[in-house]
Amino acid sequence: MPELDRIDLKILDLLQRQGRMSMTELGERVGLSTSPCSERVRRLERQRVITGYHAQVDPHALGRTLLVFVEITLSEKSKSIFEAVRREIEHMPEVIECHLVSGSFDYLVKARLAAMADYRELLGSLLDKLPVPAQSHSYVVMEEVKDSRVIPVDGL
């Protein structure tokens, strides 16, 4: 893990919140001139602390108003089965997150879709393509209370 000082952490916090901030403004906010601030950002990119910059898109503007979480429990478990599941999930653009978890089920899937009919089709396709029988439990989101990608840097 790279060593990060107070200024690095402040840079990371600011860029997570506003990735298009100019180096001049970023430098002013962290107490550096533009050149040293740019050098720090490039170092953080080289060290893969900063892994990319992304536009935050309103899913409603694209008609993707349905957000669903799905628990998937596989009937059998092995490394090859987990790899097969990974390959199938990676080819499903509606699935925006998928996590192999510990606990009473195996995968937690987050999907963003336009309508319930799309979800029904996605779930049927997913369960059909899995290498072993599986059970699923779905949770349709009624309200997104908090949706943040900001990794807290306080206390580091």
Predicted features by range, described:
Residues 1-156:
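A compositional/biophysical signature of low hydrophobicity enriched in polar/charged and small residues
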